């Protein structure tokens, strides 16, 4: 209740409060942005529904991740064009990523190659 209509100088992002489209109505007026993580939404399909619904109500989108390999991160790249922020650094936090993993260079994530999928 403390966030209702709070006038923040920076957008407040709902992370663990937002898992699926069902959560959005409760966030309106409290948050200006949501963090979409495919691990939370249950996969790419629900993440796409959530992103579209958030756009419809004027919420900004961040695409984030848990610590995971490039194989888990690659589908999230498909949401990148809808997001104001991307935080897909999960593979960088691992000692060893998958062979043929995503390439990170100069702040950019390169799209996956067919070899990533096995």
Go through the PLM ranges and name each one:
Residues 2-3, 7-89:
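Catalytic alpha/beta core domains of metabolic enzymes, predominantly
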């Amino acid at each position: 209740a403390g966030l209702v209509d709070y006038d923040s100088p920076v957008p407040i992002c709902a992370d663990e409060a937002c898992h699926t489209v069902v959560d959005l109505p409760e966030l309106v007026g409290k948050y200006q942005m949501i963090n979409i993580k495919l691990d939370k939404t249950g996969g790419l399909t629900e993440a796409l529904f959530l992103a579209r619904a958030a756009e419809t109500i004027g919420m900004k989108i961040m695409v984030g991740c848990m610590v995971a390999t490039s194989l888990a991160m690659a589908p999230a790249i498909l949401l990148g064009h809808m997001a104001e922020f991307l935080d897909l650094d999960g593979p960088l936090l691992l000692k060893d990523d998958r062979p043929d993993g995503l390439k990170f260079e100069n702040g950019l994530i390169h799209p996956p190659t067919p070899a990533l999928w096995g």
